[in-house]
Swiss-Prot record:
This is Mannosyl-oligosaccharide glucosidase. The keyword Endoplasmic reticulum applies. GO terms for cellular component: endoplasmic reticulum membrane. One of its GO terms (biological process) is oligosaccharide metabolic process. Pathway: Glycan metabolism; N-glycan degradation.
């Protein structure tokens, strides 16, 4: 029986005795007994009322917390009104904002017009349907693929390798009018091997999707060819889409193609691929003049409206063109207002004019790239320069625009009680953001985005202001931002149900402050004007982090949301930290003190304090300045996190290292805790977390703690590898250990580019300021930079991909790919921009 239950039963028994005595006395003295009975009844009524008011008060507080969790923050937006509209930002209205598809464009709108590409090689495997390619997938066998050039606004060129095929997708935008201007695509299909005796038969599928009441009117030419699509929307006005006849690559002479078309109501964006697959059920003949026919599976041969859905559901129109490679096809969007505004006089952006525009944009990209990052001037090889261009282009080409409602589990301020509540929908919000991986994580992640914008802001500061403004627009009334943004049907369809809900008690590293630091140091007037508007939201976000994640003692902090100590977990994960399975205290408790979180809060206090002073926010500066000073005071950090027995900084909590996974049939692998039993102590997990005071440059150059951290960093028995700093010491009991039977190691030894970037920035800093460790830091900086750059380049040359993580044993890429999120930081490492 629980102690609380025993207390309740004892109190109930003791409470009965006085009442019995009063009743006995009342029998002896009726009048006195009546008076005492009235007093007792009044007292009981008071108790009942107090309990009722207490319970109702708790319910009211809980209701208010739920309401605040699901209410947007009242502070003014950091962005102008209608900042995504064609009237305010016409040059950004259209874009490749669908990172999860191999090639597609959409408008920055809650009800967008969407376009996209699918393809299939016909007859590649006799007797089986062709493999239809549309969305980027980890296991579909396509690759390598990615953007060779992408400037984030007006131009891009991508190469896709798919078995025997090599596709090149290109686009150019042309400004004009009031609705975002015109754009043109060119898709080129060639055999992978030159001089092949037989040319593959390939179908390309170009489609248009509306998401509401918009009008599409197709015009069909001879033999089922979709000549054009006329349309109108409230945001685009009148427009026309035209699919030109295929030609040989680099030529303007048309080639013979076979055409099929399909038109229906919009089945829902996640169902587009399946709908097309289900309609590829009829055999047709592709018969060029003077050549033998080839059979292919095609869409229905004539245009007819199918599956008319409810009003407002939208339309889906797709054209299939089939012929033998090599060939090119161009797809053109023309805005009605751009035509009347002068673009018509310039002619359509097709053929030789399109070629000229593509070449001009490619040359301009290369010139601007060198001017911005100066890799050639700094002595980087041509291969490294190309790697830098691909890293930047992949990051910019992965920027998406999302709109929808996320699922949120409100914070009741009582850990564990959230499990008794149902998640609810957050208000509909837009998000303009980079993504970590087009194939595996094609959505916004809070702690990734800060690293993304470190790269983007060097290239296009306006894009960074747009992204930060959108992320800060997700703030709820308490100042919380969900760490993973799953907005819209397409994003939701790619996430397992158990990961859809974002918990309003859980934080994430505040990496959006990293590009804010660069803004502060750069003194760009546009950046400072943005920060002035953004400050109330930045302050609210930081205040929520500082207060909600407070630890058991002053100036300590604890990540809320660690996994429960289940019998199958070697070490309960801490997903909110971003470091997932990095070892923490073996037995989660409220007594934990997390070093990395304290360092993030210290960085936040420093940045917000400096920003408040620069903006003249005196009240906020008076609050934040002392907090920043306290958090950076060496004695406080030492007292809470320096582990003398380990010789490094560390987490603190209820911990034992006597844990392991053992086979226990039929359960499988289960955690076994040996001796000594857990006790409150520093956590002996030397790795990335141990370095955080160094990584975030919180240590004075003369600090006696700096030397030991540099020694650990440089020790191959611990963190140093020929490929970068490993995430966990090679001497750790958790090194490369699975966390469960089905959960391989993640942050337990692999090399991660984001932390290596922070380490290089810190080494660069300490190697350039006076102090006893200046020479050692500078030497380590040059060696680590060379190792990281060399390995990322070699792996890219071998595989054609940037990877999520790299092996500390042989350098090979691991995890998902392409991963042109924070791995694109290799560009800043090559440019020595920290």
């Amino acid at each position: 029986m629980a102690r609380g239950e025993r207390r309740r039963r004892a109190a109930a028994a003791e409470g009965a005795r006085p009442l019995e005595r009063a009743r006995a006395a009342g029998r002896r003295d009726g009048r006195a007994g009546g008076a005492r009975g009235s007093a007792s009844g009044a007292a009981l009524a008071v108790v009942v009322l107090a309990l009722a008011f207490g319970l109702s008060g708790r319910w009211v507080l809980a209701w208010l917390r739920v309401r605040r969790a699901l209410t947007l923050h009242p502070a003014p937006s950091a962005l102008p009104p209608d900042s995504s509209s064609p009237a305010v930002a016409p040059e950004l209205f259209w874009g490749t904002y669908r990172p999860h598809v191999y090639f597609g464009m959409k408008t920055r709108s809650p009800k967008p017009l969407l376009t996209g590409l699918m393809w299939a090689q016909q007859g590649a495997t006799p007797g089986t349907p062709p493999k239809l390619r549309h969305t980027c997938e980890q296991g579909d066998g396509v690759g390598p693929y990615g953007w060779e050039f992408h400037d984030g606004r007006t131009f891009g060129r991508q190469h896709i390798h798919d078995g025997a095929l090599r596709l090149t997708t290109e686009f150019v935008k042309r400004p004009g009018g009031q609705h975002g201007g015109d754009w043109s695509w060119r898709v080129t299909v060639e055999p992978q091997a030159s001089g092949t005796p037989s040319f593959p038969l390939v179908s390309l599928f170009f489609y248009v999707v509306t998401d509401g009441q918009e009008v599409l009117l197709p015009e069909i030419g001879a033999k089922g060819q979709l000549k054009s699509i006329s349309g109108h929307t409230s945001e685009l006005g009148d427009f026309r889409l035209t699919l030109l006849p295929p030609t040989s690559p680099g030529d303007t002479v048309p080639k013979h193609g076979s055409y099929n078309v399909f038109w229906s109501s919009n089945p829902g964006l996640p169902q587009l691929t399946d709908m097309v697959k289900s309609r590829l059920n009829s055999w047709f003949q592709h018969r060029p003049p003077g050549a033998s026919p080839d059979r292919y599976l095609g869409l229905p041969g004539s245009l007819k409206w199918e599956e008319r859905g409810p009003s407002g559901q939208g339309q889906f129109l797709i054209q299939q063109v089939t012929l033998k490679a090599p060939f090119s096809v161009e797809f053109v969007f023309e805005s009605g207002s751009a035509a009347t505004g002068g673009n018509q006089a310039s002619g359509r952006l097709v053929g030789s004019q399109l070629t000229q525009a593509l070449e001009s944009h490619a040359a301009a990209f290369k010139e601007r790239f060198e001017k911005t990052f100066q890799l050639k001037e700094k002595g980087l090889s041509p291969e490294e320069q190309a790697l830098g261009q691909v890293a930047l282009s992949g990051l910019l080409g992965g920027i998406g625009y999302f709109y929808g409602q996320g699922l949120v589990l409100p914070d009741t301020s009582m850990e564990g009680s959230e499990q008794k509540m149902d998640p609810a929908l957050f208000p509909p919000v837009p998000l303009f953001s980079g993504v970590p991986s087009r194939s595996f994580f094609p959505r916004g992640f809070l702690w990734d985005e800060g690293f993304h914008q470190l790269v983007v802001q060097r290239w296009d500061p306006h894009l960074t202001r747009e992204a930060l403004g959108h992320w800060l627009g997700l703030l709820n009334a308490d100042g919380w931002i969900g760490r993973e943004q799953i907005l819209g049907d397409e994003a939701r369809a790619r996430v397992p149900p158990e990961f859809l809900v974002q918990r309003a008690a859980h934080a994430n590293p505040p990496t959006l402050l990293l590009p804010v630091v660069h803004m502060l140091e750069g003194h760009d007037p546009d950046d400072l004007a943005f920060l002035r508007k953004a400050f109330p939201r930045l302050h609210a976000w930081f205040s929520w982090l500082h207060q909600s994640q407070a630890g058991p003692v002053p100036l300590s902090y604890r990540w809320r949301g660690r996994d429960l100590a289940l019998p199958t977990l070697l070490n309960p994960k801490t997903l909110p930290s971003g470091l997932d399975d990095y070892p923490r205290a073996s037995h989660p408790s409220t007594a934990e003190r997390h070093l990395d979180l304290r360092c993030w809060v210290a960085l936040g206090a420093r940045v917000l304090s400096q920003l408040a002073e620069q903006l003249g926010e005196t009240e906020a500066a008076a609050e934040l300045g002392p907090l920043a000073a306290s958090l950076e005071e060496p004695g406080s950090l030492d007292e809470l996190h320096w582990a003398p027995e380990l010789g490094v900084f560390a987490d603190f909590g209820n911990h034992t290292k006597a844990v392991q996974l053992k086979s226990r049939p039929p359960q499988g692998l289960v955690r076994v805790v040996g001796r000594p039993p857990p006790r409150l102590q520093y956590v002996d997990a030397l790795g990335y977390v141990s370095l955080f005071p160094l990584l975030l440059q919180l240590l004075d150059p003369s600090s006696p703690r700096l030397g030991p951290l540099l020694d650990v960093l440089a020790d191959s028995r611990h963190l140093w590898s020929p490929f970068g700093l490993r995430s966990l010491s090679a001497s750790s009991l958790f090194y490369k250990q699975r966390n469960t039977e089905h959960d391989p190691p993640y942050w337990r030894g692999a090399v991660w580019l984001n932390i290596n970037y922070l380490a290089l920035g810190a080494l660069h800093h300490y190697g350039h300021v006076e102090g006893p460790h200046k020479v050692q830091a500078a030497k380590l900086y040059h060696e680590l930079r060379a190792n990281v750059v060399r390995n990322v380049r070699q792996q890219y040359q071998a595989t054609g991909f940037l990877w999520e993580q790299y092996s500390d044993q042989d350098g090979r890429g691991m995890g998902c790919r392409p991963f042109q999120g924070w791995t694109s930081l290799v560009l800043l490492i090559m440019a020595e921009e920290y």
